[in-house]
Amino acid sequence: MIFQSFILGNLVSLCMKIINSVVVVGLYYGFMTTFSIGPSYLFLLRARVMEEGEEGTEKKVSATTGFIAGQLMMFISIYYAPLHLALGRPHTITVLALPYLLFHFFWNNPKHFFDYGSTTRNSMRNLSIQCVFLNNLIFQLFNHFLLPSSMLARLVNIYMFRCNNKMLFVTSSFVGWLIGHILFMKWVGLVLVWMQQKNSIRSNVLIRFNKYLVSELRNSMARIFSILLFITCIYYLGRIPSPIFTKKLKVKETSETEERDVEIEKTFERGGTKQGQEVSAEEDPSPSLFSEEKEDPDKIEETEEIRVNGKEKKKTKHEFHLRFKETCDKNSPVYETSYLDGNQENSKFEIFQLFKEKKEEKYLLWFEKPLVTLLFDYKRWTRPLRYKKNNRFENAVRNEMSHYFFYACRSDGKERISFTYPASLSTFLDMIKKNNYFFATEKLSSDEFSTHWNYTNNQKIKNLSKEFRNRLEGLDKGSLIRDILEKRTQLCNDKTKKKYLPKTYDPLLNGPYRGRIKKFFSPPILNTTYIKNKIRTPWINKIHNLIFINDYHEFEQTIDRFNRKSFSSEEVRSLLTEREREHIDSEDRIKSLNFLFDAVITDPNDQKIRKKAIKEISKRVPRWSYKLIDNVYQELGEYDENVRGKHAFRSRKAKRLVVAVDHQTKGDVSLPHYLEQSDFRRYIIKGSMRAQRRKTVIWKPVQANAHSPLFLDRIDKTLYLSFDISQLMKVILRNWMVKNKNQKLSDYTNAKTRKLDKKEKKKLKGERYQRQEMVRIKQAEGWDKRLLTRILRSSMLVIQSILRKYIVLPLLIIAKNVVRILLFQDPEWSEDFKDWNREIYVKCTYSGVNLSETEFPKNWLIEGIQIKILFPFHLKPWHGSTIQSSHKDPKSEQETDVCFLTIFGLETDMPFGSPQKRRSFFEPIFKELKKKIRKLKTKSFIVLRDFKEGKIKELSKINLREIEKLRETQKNSIISKQMIHEPSIEISSMDWTKLSRTEKKMKDLTNRTSRIRNQIYKITKEKKKGSLTQETNISSNKPTYSVKILDPSKRIWRILKKRNARLIRKSYLFLKFGIEKIYRNIFISTLTIPRINTKPFRESTRKQMKIIEKNIHNNEANPERINKTNKNRIISTIQKLISKTSNKNSKISCNLLSFSQSQAYVFYKLLQVPILNFYNLRPVLQYHGTSLFLKNEIKDFFEKHGIFNYQLRHKPLWNFGRNTRKHCLSGHYQYDLSRIKWARLVPQEWRNRANQHCMAQNKDLIKRDSYEKNGLTHYEKQHFFEADLLRNQKSNFKKHYRYDLLSYKSLNYEDKKDSYIDRSLVQVNNKEEYYSNYNRKKVKLLAMLGSISINNYIGEDDIMDMEKFLYRKYFDWRILNFCLRNKANMEAWVDMDTGTSSNQNTRIGSNNYQKINAINNRVPFYLTIHQDEEINPSTQKGFFCDWMGMNEEILSCPISNPESWFFPEFVLLFNAYRTKPWIIPIKLLLFNFNGNSKKNRTGKKEADLFISPTQKEYFELSNQSKEENELADQGTPRSDAQKQVILGSVLSNQEKDGEENYTGSDMKTRIKKKQSKRETEVQLDFFLKRYLCLQLRWRGAVSFREKILNDMQVYCHLVRLINPSDVAIASIQRGEMSLPILITKKKFALKELTKGGMLIIEPRRLSVKNDGQFFLYQIVGIALVHKNKRKITKRYQEKGYVDKKDFDEFIAKHQKMTGNRNKNHYDLLVPETILLPKRRRELRTLICFNSKNQNGMQKNPVFFNNGKGGGRVLDKNKNLAREKNQLIQLKFFIWANSRLEDLICMNRYWFNTNNGSRFSMVRVHMYPRLKIR
């Protein structure tokens, strides 16, 4: 078995080696190349198939030989560079393919030049066989394009980059191609034989067999192939840039030798610079080389190597390599000349050589240059390239050069090809290799280099570990920390004065991110002071010496060329003209600037050369040799003389939308209006071949939209024969439903179908509207396609307007009134002509913008015009009264108020719309005639009715007895009919089975009616018998009383009979309506109950909670006051519970307020149980995730007050290592950041809070010491720590070790006892204790809102690049008044709403607002929302409800009150979100809100981030002077509370201002009061600048474009009218002007607009460009606590805050603190922090790259020795072992598991990369999840 497995393993490995070998891969790629069929296959197939006989065999052999030889040349060209250059250039195809294809076409088409039948014995001398060979050979060299693509042919080229043995790979790929070719030809032969043997194919019914068909086909084969080749030729013309049919760009260059010589001599005299170029281009009237192009002197030398007849020519323009440098003054650019060879004399010689070459080139290439440019310039404009404009250079860089390219580099110990290798590095490396003979030329193999790489890394690890161990040993010996810590080396500028460079300029601190110090001196200062102070030995660039070692000895002493006296002589200036004097002055200025960089100065003391210049390795970038502009710049050229010419590239089709006309400048304010069609142009240069475009392809015969080939798979490709199955099913179902329409459905289904019919009608209406809109757009595009159509339409519209106004309408008025006169009616001349005068013709632009009645738009005949008719005239037969007109439909009035004129003189609603259907002139006439006819009919009917009534009266005179007899007989007949009717029903009921469904229902209905009728008859008969007298004489002739009573009963019976039948028929509907009515009444009554009772309940709860807040905060003075004042059962139960579990004298924090009524309700429900076992809540409180039943506030409140079992804190915690990242991060509030913060990595102030949480206040949950006794001590420590932190915060802000948060905080939490790095800074004394890990979660983002400005969380961290733009901030626009004229209005922008409490013991909070008076100091304007819970009830209503004066009306509304008793904790964040939207994530709204008024003093530390640098200096000075005073004022808690300042309010005491007014209200304004005069101007400037950072969004269904543009059209028209009131009223009535948008007040506040819901103005995020320095200073870090971080003063040491001896003692997080209560303990300091961050990163990286441990984390060998824990540093406290706690194990690794943002952050920071695309250079291995031993 072992032998078999051994053999099997060897076989598998052998097979893998064979598969991965170069030969097999080459065979595979060569075989794949066979399927790339090109045009050469046509000749090969013709020779193989059509040729017969001996000559045919020879032609087959020659075709096959030429085919194989051509393919072999293609493979060899891959390896052989000269052949590749000859066949790979685009001009090769242009030279070879087109003439050869055209020759074949004209050779084979008209006649045969060679007789294929006559052959000689020597077949090689036969020209036809040679042509067959050449055809197959040459066509094989062309590009493969036919089937399927050229990608298969390029597979071999691509794999060449990865292959080491290239020649073997080329050979094997050729063999593979040969095998594939032989197989393909054999397959073709088999197919042909099969087709000859198949008689069914030859004798097809559709193809009539002809015995001469084969011979005719064989004779015409040459012609068929010539046609195919002609098609190929045309296809190549589409793909290759043809120099014949394209548009030429005119590059204007003068060819006069004298002017060119003069220009070159001028540049030669100026030392190779073109300093006078701009001046000569602007002022010299004579044309020069640069005068026509108006180019900057930034043009880069452009060289192209051209191979013509084996010679290389060099075409060079006189453009010298200049680099543009921006100086401090942007208006005065300085040009710095940089020579690649570093020698100025050599540059002069090179310029002279270029001058001579240019003169020779002029004579040699006077006829060759045009031909060469036309045929071989493959970089010309005909390529489908986009013209990319670069603002720093005049000409644009070609879009064909990549910033990176392929290059072999070493990565992870192996040589790999990097496709993102910087070009400058490879250029630099090549220069060093050529010039430095010390450079190693031999190449190491990959294995040797990997071994060498590993050896080097191991040596580095040993050295670093040894140094690290030595430092730790020194720490164990008790050495000072300042001696142990590694120091940074800082570059000193002066040894005596010890002036250090700024951090941004120090190369030892910032490396490649340092900047350049720009110092400028005038020439006299340079000669006097600069040289005296800088007498030193010369410093020569070592890199320059290394690269240009041959040119180093050619340096010689030169005298300063610049001498100002030679240019400022008045004698010389008097001899020159004014133009020449200006010319020389401009040259002086440019020379003086250039002198700062290029002058070679001679030091008289040491006679050494000092060259003040910066050598930079730069690359020549190919640029366009011409400057192109678009149509926008072409229009600007009409006003700007510097921009001239016609646009040379095609931009998107657009029309000028003229919004208004500026009468001062006499110009139009226009916007581009783009047509609603796809953009096929895509800014392609004119004349470029569109068929060569790769990103916009056309694959259909007719294609409406431009698509990219990347998204072709997402486009529905519908075939011609395809059909939609769903539509077909709909048609079938519809037909089936039509067949069964005779079946009567129920009323319910009928109602449903009616609803569906309504929906379908709406849908059809919308589709009809869309169809009309599409027709309108097509008409507009049709008119817009041609210039002639627009001219024709514009002229037709003007003619139609004149005809309509002055000819047609007056003629109609005359005709109408003449007819009225003929009909003897009054004429209406005045009314008609009044309406005619009211009609106004407004000239509009092509897109419909109103201009004026008289003036035409600019270029209206070419661009087009629209004519809008206001109050169009409609001829009326008569003018009615106002009463009749008031009943008209307002919609019809709106339709007729405005319209557009068509070219046929008709009216339409919108431009290019269909004509409107107007009311006919005769329609009201016909209506009136119909009314008169109807009245006539009614009158005639009345006459006839009267006549009929008279006849009836005459008939009533008949004898009554005869009538009675008739009645009796009628009665008998009715009874008899009833008797006969019943059996008929019974008889017919026997045939029910044969009846239809409807007939059955009718029978049932008749039976029911007959039954009811009989019952009614019986009942009436019985009643009649009881009511009548018994003396009834039936035989008497006179009618008795009983007979008279029977008549009304019969009538009643008949009425009931009809109504019962109707009631039975409609019973279903009655029942339905009744049920709906009952349901509605019940439902509405239930809805009204909470609406009635909610308001008083909410008022009562609000009052109760205010009492709760007041009582809870005042329980220090009166602990029993709560039970007296609060009679509510909820709070009394809570208070009893708290009193049982905590000391009565302890301070109850205000966490209760955070969950307000809603949490109180939950407490009430929990505490209703009389005996509550809190041990049952243990799993709920222990779980650190999201609880399903309890909110986080309840859980944290229970934990803080020790309500649950105290032993819980000693139990093992939740295992975060097995949780997901969400649980891991949510369990620790340091990670409670928004996604925006994690994405941008910009939490500046949060890093200071990460290590300094809240100061603990209880020793242990068992002891629960009261806070009241030692409150001042806690405040002192907090205050002094903050004061010290404030002074050092600016320096801490720029520390390098911000990356530590990501590396230290990313530890795996599976082992709970190893989570020490997460521990925060805690200062402990006898009365204080730290928070344990289980309740760490309580300090949430919202928990700090009481002490820290909420803007620290929502504003500061989310603005990018806050280092550079600290004064740029979000701004709230909802409170600003638009009138910026008065300072009073400025101060009224913000409501100074401060709230205080009457009790002195309570610490007072306020509404921390800021005045805008400090804006001129560039202080960020932000609004701090209310942060304290102890607010007066009178002001609390204003806090929640009347926020910034925005909700005066909403305050009285009980439903929309923000202070909802359901979610009161959302109010603070909601208000902050309204101040700065899109900052607070939704996730944070559900976190804790534990505001503590005691923490208000800590707010100064975060607010320092918002203070400008000038204010900070003042603030630091004031803090230093007040520290002594604050120590004296710490006598009692009451005096300390009185020291608290109402934040945001303006106090007179400057000491308090400096202490608490940290929000930067107007600190510097009080120091410099003179600046208040310019305050309004600065505020206005502030207003306008912030306006640019906002975006506007409209609320409502109407889009912004439609609503605003409609109003703008009306406004632009009203401005031009003399009396616009009538037109304005009419437009308001028509709905064209929206009154909410129309601003009528001069002074208004934006809150009125936002309150109405019309406008929503939201801030837009600032956009800045991120560079390396941004990522350097914005990376998240943790504040390390050591002496360099915190300068510990003597006061701290006296108070016991810092103890040096306890600095290195580390306490486990879950260990009891009973033995160490009197000691101070800090965060666990990672010992590696002794090293500098750079060395620390290097050590960890080397450990991770070289460690082979796969079972655990990557460990530091200093601490981990065979699984043993820590060193002596960590073993000092031996009590840890007695408590059965494991020793601390420090586990380090580079990045966290599965956290890509950490990897990106560290990647950029560690490897100094500021570009995301360079991450592929750093091949970092993502380790799997690390395990715990």
From Swiss-Prot:
Biased composition (Basic and acidic residues): 260-272
Pfam families for this protein: Ycf1
Presence of keyword Membrane: yes
Domain of life assignment: Eukaryota
Span list, region Disordered: 260-301
GO biological process, one term: protein transport
Cellular compartment(s): Plastid, Chloroplast inner membrane
Residues passing through the membrane, by range: 18-38, 67-87, 90-110, 127-147, 174-194, 224-244
Any one Gene Ontology cellular component term annotated for this protein: chloroplast inner membrane
Membrane topology term: Multi-pass membrane protein
Keywords: Chloroplast, Membrane, Plastid, Plastid inner membrane, Protein transport, Transmembrane, Transmembrane helix, Transport
Family (UniProt): Belongs to the TIC214 family.
Quaternary structure and interacting proteins, as annotated: Part of the Tic complex.
Misc. comment: There is a partial copy of the N-terminus (positions 1-363) of ycf1 in the inverted repeat (ABI49067).
Name under which the protein is recorded: Protein TIC 214
Organism in which the protein naturally occurs: Citrus sinensis (Sweet orange)
Lineage: Eukaryota, Viridiplantae, Streptophyta, Embryophyta, Tracheophyta
This protein's encoding gene: TIC214
